[in-house]
Regions:
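Catalytic phosphate/nucleotide-handling subdomain of diverse soluble enzymes
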Residues: 42-48, 53-69, 200-206, 210-212, ...
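Secretory-pathway/luminal and periplasmic proteins that interact with or process carbohydrate-rich
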Residues: 46-51, 117, 132-140, 200-201, ...
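Extracytoplasmic mature domains of secreted/periplasmic and thylakoid-lumen proteins
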Residues: 116-168
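Accessory "access/gating" subregions that flank catalytic or transport cores
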Residues: 11-26, 145-168, 174-188, 192-199, ...
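Conserved structured core elements
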Residues: 31-36, 52, 56, 99-102, ...
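An N-terminal structural lobe/cap that precedes and organizes the functional/catalytic core
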Residues: 14-42, 46-103
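Aromatic-rich carbohydrate-recognition surfaces in CAZymes
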Residues: 88-124, 128-137
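Acidic, carboxylate-rich catalytic segments that either coordinate divalent cations
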Residues: 1-13, 238-274, 323-359
Length: 359
């Protein structure tokens, strides 16, 4: 059985260091948080035009465009890509366009600004209703939002008429809870649990806790293996997500290329829906391993793996961006953003990314 309450999850997690005893350096922490925001935006933007595509379709698109090595944002092709994606393609980027992967970081920030460490599932639910338009949330989030409007509140909102509750929607909301808990993965995971439990259960919850804990740990830890293990230490040891992550770590350590690792991932968890938490989390782990010292390689191989490409690219970009810091991110990925982020969150429609990082 895979639990969905925080008490049970904590009881089944492996041993781990809950406080990494980070030495506080305000300027360095700001640079890391800014790097995370920028990295998240860049990874999301790279994956946005091909969201939902399988790897084979992405490979064909690159071949048709005569791109042997992907080392920049994707080119636009009006015959294949919808016009709405033009602003997300090479040479056409003026800012980070609206994406739900970025909206939820702002939503979480607003809830935290309101209630801080006391942010509860109910606080987050009310923040959604107050700040998010209903027609621009999807799958599990749409089901949960509908439940809120019918006075079905957490935790029941996660399971009532919600067949998507192990999909990736909670995992993409994790980042802010890691940003605000430097070196404290247990607290980051707890805040992520409060958020995830309004719309997800089981591995849907674990995905968000896993990512938040990794981000908290990345403020202090150097190796991606240690960062991933910090994430694993906050979720049940024997859940399907933990198993997929451990398998992927083994393949990354024993196989010479990300393509071979992808083959193993596809054989093992490729049967899940393309928007499920588990298979996409495996791609995130792959991207972290192969991008440990190379931001570009990390987001590129993750997005080329297919499935929910804007989500996985965003998470890998966020973790690597935080680990490396804003000053160490390649200009060709960051400069086109022009420090600007569009959003559908009420009263937060157009922000400077640097201002969001300061908050």
């Amino acid at each position: 059985a895979e639990p969905s309450t925080l008490v049970e999850i904590k009881a089944e997690r492996p041993d781990g260091k809950r406080d990494l005893e980070l030495k506080w350096d305000k300027d360095r922490i700001y640079e890391q948080i800014l790097g995370a925001w920028l990295g998240r935006a860049a990874g999301c933007l790279l994956g946005k035009p091909v969201e939902g595509w399988p790897k084979a379709r992405i490979d064909k698109y690159l071949k048709d465009k005569k791109i042997e090595i992907l080392d920049d944002y994707l080119p636009f092709d009006e015959k294949i890509l919808p016009g709405v994606h033009k602003v997300s393609t090479k040479g056409n980027i003026k800012f980070m366009p609206r994406d739900d992967d970025m909206d939820y970081v702002i939503i979480g920030l607003l809830a935290l600004e309101n209630r801080g460490i006391k942010t509860s599932p109910r606080t987050l639910a009310h923040t959604w209703v107050d700040r998010l338009p209903f027609n621009l949330v999807y799958t599990a989030e749409e089901c949960a939002y509908r439940n809120f409007t019918n006075s079905i509140w957490p935790p029941m909102s996660a399971t009532h008429r919600n067949p998507f509750r192990e999909w990736i929607g909670a995992q993409i909301r994790a980042d802010i809870f890691g940003y605000v808990t430097p070196g404290l993965p247990e607290i980051g995971a707890k805040l992520a649990f409060n958020d995830a439990s309004i719309s997800h259960d089981k591995n849907g919850i674990y995905g968000e806790m896993f990512v938040a804990a990794m981000l908290s740990a990345a403020f202090k830890l150097e190796s991606v293996k240690d960062i991933i293990n910090a994430g694993l230490s906050e979720i049940p040891k024997n859940c399907r997500l933990s198993e997929a992550v451990r398998d992927t770590m083994h393949w990354c350590e024993t196989l010479p290329s990300w393509e071979l690792v992808w083959e193993k991932i596809n054989e093992s968890v490729g049967h899940y829906h393309g928007v499920h938490t588990i298979n996409n989390a495996a791609l995130i782990v792959m991207g972290l391993y192969f991008g440990e010292n190379d931001f570009e390689k990390g987001i590129v191989c993750t997005v080329r793996g297919g499935w929910d490409t804007d989500c996985t690219g965003a998470t890998v970009g966020s973790i690597l961006g935080l680990r490396l810091g804003a000053n160490n991110l390649p200009s060709k990925w960051i400069s086109p953003l022009n420090d600007r982020l569009k959003s559908v969150v009420r009263d937060e429609n157009d922000n400077k990314i640097s201002d969001l990082a300061k908050r």
